Amino acid sequence: MNNNPSLYEKELSFQADRRRAGVEFIKIISDLWYDKSIEMVLFRNQLIDKNVSEILNLHEYAGEFVGKPISIFDSVEIAREMLSLDLPPSKLDIGKLTYEYHLEDDKYHNTKSFVIDKLRKAKESNSIKPKDVVLYGFGRIGRLLARELM
């Protein structure tokens, strides 16, 4: 019998690896959001509270959007580096960062140097000060909408 894995087995293994990467990506996004107040988006698509298949579908959509594949594995690698940095509360587009990483990968010898270079000005920004807001006459839906807009 042939010891080489069949095309089916290779594809099955690849899909399992993608799903594992998706699970790790969700954990990193949750850690960034809940521990560091860093919101991650993928070309303006919310990533928090998404399941693995939604994350993978968003990556496929992002690849179609920019005309170049956006890999979940690259997104995980960049998100992992963001988690290791001390960044202020922010909203970051990991799709844009992953796309730029592919465009400029010859400039950087690893992902960490890319992320540090791209986010170096983040620490220079003014700190966000919380501000209480009272909304009258909006109702429950209006308050939910206002919360999303802030």
Question: Which ranges hold each PLM region?
Answer:
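N-terminal ligand-binding/catalytic initiation module
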Residues: M1-K129, E148-M150
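Glycine-rich adenosine-cofactor-binding loop
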Residues: S127-L149
